[in-house]
UniProtKB/Swiss-Prot annotation:
It is a peripheral membrane protein. InterPro entries: GlcNAc_MurG, Glyco_trans_28_C, GlycoTrans_28_N. The keyword Membrane applies. It comes from the Bacteria. This is UDP-N-acetylglucosamine--N-acetylmuramyl-(pentapeptide) pyrophosphoryl-undecaprenol N-acetylglucosamine transferase. It comes from Wolbachia sp. subsp. Brugia malayi (strain TRS). GO terms for cellular component: plasma membrane. Coiled coil: none annotated. Cell wall formation. Catalyzes the transfer of a GlcNAc subunit on undecaprenyl-pyrophosphoryl-MurNAc-pentapeptide (lipid intermediate I) to form undecaprenyl-pyrophosphoryl-MurNAc-(pentapeptide)GlcNAc (lipid intermediate II). It holds the Pfam family Glyco_transf_28. Disulfide bonds: none annotated. It is found in: Cell membrane.
Amino acid sequence: MDIVLATGGTGGHIFPAITLARAIKRQGYDSILFADKKTGKNTDVKDYTLPLNKPGGNKFRFFLLLIYSCVLALYQIRKLKPKLVIGFGGYASFPTLLAAKVLSIPIILHEQNAVLGRVNKFFFNSAELIATSFPETKYAKGNKCVFIGNFVDIKAKSHSSTKKILTVLIIAGSQGANFFDDVVSSVICNLPIEIRKKIRVVQQCMKKNMNKVEGLYKGGQVICELSEFFDDMGSRLTDAHLVISRAGATSIAEITLARRPAIYIPYPCSKDDHQFYNAEYIKDSGAAVVVEQNSEVKKNLTKLLVNLLGDSQKLRDMANNTKKIRIKNGVTEFIRIVIHKLG
């Protein structure tokens, strides 16, 4: 085995690892994902599932599973004998990175967010290289920290300006998605009728909320398409005139590289407040607006949507401003580093 990728937890950690695994395979190298139960199965990517669940609720059970996962990871890594372990942060990467450290296997870390996460911070001194997704990453200082970019499979494409219907793409992410299903949908359905008639909503929606949200849009006379997950995000972004999203690092990278204007609503309970720092980096570019999830969110979001959806030139200006943002797809550059490390 050439490379083990340590990931899991949320899509922000998982999807960059999957993108990198596919790129590694195209270069003729072998890799496997070590992740938790949330990762799911990807037929074209090898994976090994650790029996971890998200921390919360029964903490004693979580720590028992964490210890068990560390033992399993140590056994599997010793058996596979990889030349390199790449960690993507998050609690689910801890057992695999610990095994690599114990077995003296070279470690590279990839940090998706604008603030170094707790697991990556823990293994900072053990890593040979820390690849960052933002030009400036809080707590990631020193010569071994290199701005590489995030790993996404998105390319900028222009959409037809002749379309009279504006597509609003809503990406809830895996954290705090109920808020988008309840609050954001409600705000859109209470916009002035002249705006509701000229928009089409494409929304990532929790399965349990699907009927409720669909009924809400139907009652508000808003054309909608709902899905629990979009596996063609590149196409969805191409069709979008405006994106409403959490401020996860991978979402920001995809939206920015697709050259789309956005409204970011940072998840207020994100670890180390990383979504706030991600959004802080973006907000001064003129390509996006940040709305805080607080008691004023409905009023602020309503005012913003009325202004943006009523001004197509403003949306085009915001899209052009994405070019100013130093967000890049780092797959090619990172692969060169990995190949050099493998010798």
